[in-house]
Amino acid sequence: MNEMQRYLAEEVAEDLADGIINRREAIRRLGLLGVTGAAATGMLATVGAEAAAAGSEHSGNRDGRRTGSESSWAPVAQESITFAGPRVPLMAAWAPTARPRGAVLVIHENRGLNVHISTVAGRLAASGYSALALDLLSEEGGTGSFPGEAEVAAALAQIPPERHVEDMKAALTELGRRVPHKKLAAIGFCFGGAMVWRLLTSNEPRLAAGAPFYGPFPEGGSFAGSRAAVLGVYGGLDSRVIATLPAAKAALEAQRLRFELITFTEANHAFFNDTGARFNPHAAIEAWRRVLNWFDDAVDDDDDHD
């Protein structure tokens, strides 16, 4: 089991510990990820004990706030596109704006390219950044070719992270073609946050900014070759991902990149997803404001915008 496969499996165990899925569904999802028998039982027990010790059980709605909502952010309409990839055409949702401040690559959670992630691209476009939300399952026929979220996560886990990086680099090339002479940024959530970290640590000089949300930093990651300004966003209750924050900080400091790593103390993993059980509206609104300010600083170099 590689680093990303373990992360995705432990996320299933956390969903059980937080009451989002039941034990039967957790066992089924772990089986799709190749974790069965005693290994599955042990993982569920270990993560459950850690969650209880951290006081995060059922923490998706600790303070009584609603656990999902229609977003109040008005997105620009998105269109489905395909473009050249390293092996096959890649699928994406494209949200353009007439006078872009820059262009942003959006990387989805372990649920794949769904309406929520497409809408994030639309929100970015509404804020002045043309955005492309990539489907990292393009080679498998796209997210829509799978029967459910568990199967999507299992498929993502089987793909070498290096292939995801190649596809993201192709998406940056497409962004540069569609939005020429503008700086590029990347944002990702959960699994997508981990992928943005990997893109930032892949000797990729084209990124002016990156905003990984609650994604684990890769073991041994180095920012050599990067010039990006990095805003890392974490939930304080997300102990598993928070544990990788010191490594991210050390690597950023080693390369002397501009960065900020912010933690929303009362928020959990996936707090930005307004369709999910751990949605925290206060943290999500503030995180979005911080991201837009970060991109305005690092990506937008045009003084003509109002």
Region annotations inferred by a language model:
Residues 20-28, 37-59:
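N-terminal twin-arginine translocation
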Residues 170-226:
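Primarily recognizes the serine-hydrolase "nucleophile elbow" in alpha/beta-hydrolase
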Residues 101-109:
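Short beta-strand element of the alpha/beta-hydrolase
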Residues 232-234:
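Short beta-strand/loop motif that positions the catalytic acidic residue
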Residues 58-96:
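N-terminal cap/lid segment of alpha/beta-hydrolase-fold proteins
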Residues 137-162, 270-275:
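Cap/lid segment of the alpha/beta-hydrolase catalytic domain
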Residues 153-177:
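Alpha/beta-hydrolase active-site loop
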Residues 1-25:
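N-terminal secretory signal peptides
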